[in-house]
A protein has these predicted regions:
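Transmembrane alpha-helices and immediately adjacent membrane-cytoplasm interface residues
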Residues: 36-67
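Long, non-transmembrane cytosolic or organellar matrix-exposed soluble domains/tails
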Residues: 193-266
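Structural motif corresponding to the intra-repeat A-B loop/turn of tetratricopeptide repeats
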Residues: 70, 108, 145, 188-189, ...
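"A position-specific structural signal for the A-helix of alpha-solenoid helical repeats
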Residues: 62, 93-100, 136-140, 144, ...
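Solenoid-like repeat scaffolds
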Residues: 47-53, 82-91, 119-129, 157-170, ...
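Membrane-proximal, non-transmembrane interface segments of integral membrane proteins
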Residues: 66-155
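Alpha-helical repeat scaffolds
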Residues: 76-84, 112-122, 148-163, 190-204, ...
């Protein structure tokens, strides 16, 4: 991600120049042994490089947190999208950025734009994993659009990839994503699956963006399991996170439906 923040590179180069000047002074002015001087310069160079990389990673995470912690997809897009041009011909960086931007646009309800961004994803070295990530993202967008047939098609293809993956090329996060998507799709059809596992996922510590999504998933599963009280509690948690996220808005819709149903029964 360092390519996205050229000024961090400039600072790193200035620090490296300072290190070289210091090394020269140690050798010429103080008469320090050449071998020791070279060793000191090598260590200082590694520290400078590591510091530069950490600075860039920290800046990238800070921007991601606008979406993941602040739950503000519109502001995230305004900050993050201009960086896309700086990715240049670095396909892994492009893929990561397009996936996050697609997620942000989908949460604003701009589904066609979200799908277009996934279509722009470049080929990468770890193509199997990339294909799995993109299929999972596409499946979730179709669920958000309530186009369940298209979502099911994407998920069937993703599950086939998971089944065929004997070397863990997809990665554990993609495998778990496939499981969650199957649970969500089943719940949308009134089938409750993996209830205990979903409860454990929802109870795990997550950034607010993911926590809201997991609480919605739990609420939907409990609804399908005819546990209205439990569903209501989970949906209230999901809806309470923000109005900027699809998961929160969907939870509020389901909650309103539950309350309307309860009023009729009363």
């Amino acid at each position: 991600m360092i390519v996205l923040y050229p000024f961090v590179v400039v600072v790193g180069l200035l620090c490296e120049a300072a290190v070289l000047v210091l090394g020269s002074m140690l050798h010429t002015t103080l008469g320090l042994n050449l071998g020791i001087t070279v060793a000191i310069l090598a260590v200082a160079t590694l520290i400078t490089f590591a510091g530069t990389m950490l600075s860039a990673t920290g800046m990238h995470q800070k921007q991601l947190n606008i979406l993941l912690r602040d739950m503000d997809p519109e502001r995230f897009i305004s900050v993050y999208e201009p960086l896309l041009k700086k990715a240049g011909k670095r396909p892994n960086v492009q893929l990561t950025m397009l996936a996050y931007l697609s997620t942000a646009y989908a949460n604003l309800g701009q589904y066609e734009k979200a799908l277009e961004l996934l279509d722009e994803a470049p080929s990468v070295k770890e193509q199997v994993r990339a294909d799995g990530l993109l299929l999972g993202n596409r499946c979730l967008i179709y669920i958000q659009m309530n186009q369940l047939d298209k979502a099911a098609d994407c998920l069937t293809r993703l599950e086939a990839m998971v089944k065929a993956d004997k070397t863990n090329a997809l990665g554990g996060d993609v495998v778990q994503s496939a499981r969650c998507l199957r649970i969500r799709l089943n719940a949308s059809k009134g089938w409750a699956t993996d209830v205990a596992w979903v409860k454990a996922v929802a109870a795990s510590g997550q950034p607010p963006f993911y926590a809201a999504s997991n609480q919605l998933m739990l609420g939907q599963v409990l609804l399908a399991d005819h546990n209205k009280a439990g569903a209501k509690a989970s949906l209230e948690k999901a809806a309470g996170y923000s109005t900027n996220l699809w998961a929160c808005r969907r939870a509020a819709e389901l909650l309103a439906g539950l309350e309307a149903s309860a009023s009729k029964e009363a």
